[in-house]
């Protein structure tokens, strides 16, 4: 969600510069970004792509011709996790950005029986390391409530 565009806080040029900076930093570490998807709408625009609605993930799935079942979707907000869960993807919370504020909300949701398969990592680097080591599979199969996989 990039509602700052709809609210006039910044424009596409600024967002593009942010994306370019992110891609450059990742490229310097040997990584790459193949595509960036985002919702530019505000909370009251009634679009299908604003999280927690799953429209954006469905669009990604269609464009890339891949299924979403079990695909890790990493985020720092409850709406990120709910969006992933709504598509059958694997919700992954990182405890950076909004993550520390989201953690108690996740625990409350799990107490109500939702988002039980959510994995939790300290940061994106910890998630990436686990993914590259192949450790996610064991974390997924043992997930009961939240799993701190860091």
Positions of PLM-derived features:
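Short linear capping/connector segments at secondary-structure termini
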Residues: 1-5, 38-43
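Asp-based, Mg2+/Mn2+-dependent phosphohydrolase catalytic module
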Residues: 12-35, 42-73, 77-150
């Amino acid at each position: 969600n990039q509602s700052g565009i709809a609210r006039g806080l910044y424009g596409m040029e600024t967002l593009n510069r942010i994306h370019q900076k992110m891609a450059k930093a990742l490229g310097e570490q040997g990584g790459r970004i193949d595509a960036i998807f985002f919702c530019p709408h505000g909370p009251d625009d009634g679009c299908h792509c604003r999280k927690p609605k799953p429209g954006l993930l469905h669009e990604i799935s269609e464009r890339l011709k891949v299924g979403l079942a079990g695909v890790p979707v990493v985020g720092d907000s409850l709406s990120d996790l709910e969006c992933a869960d709504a598509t059958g993807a694997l919700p992954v919370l990182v405890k950076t950005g909004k993550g520390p504020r989201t953690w108690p909300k996740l625990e409350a949701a799990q107490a109500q029986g939702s988002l039980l398969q959510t994995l939790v990592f300290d940061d994106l680097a910890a998630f990436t390391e686990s993914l590259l080591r192949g450790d996610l599979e064991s974390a997924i199969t043992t997930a009961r409530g939240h799993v701190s996989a860091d």
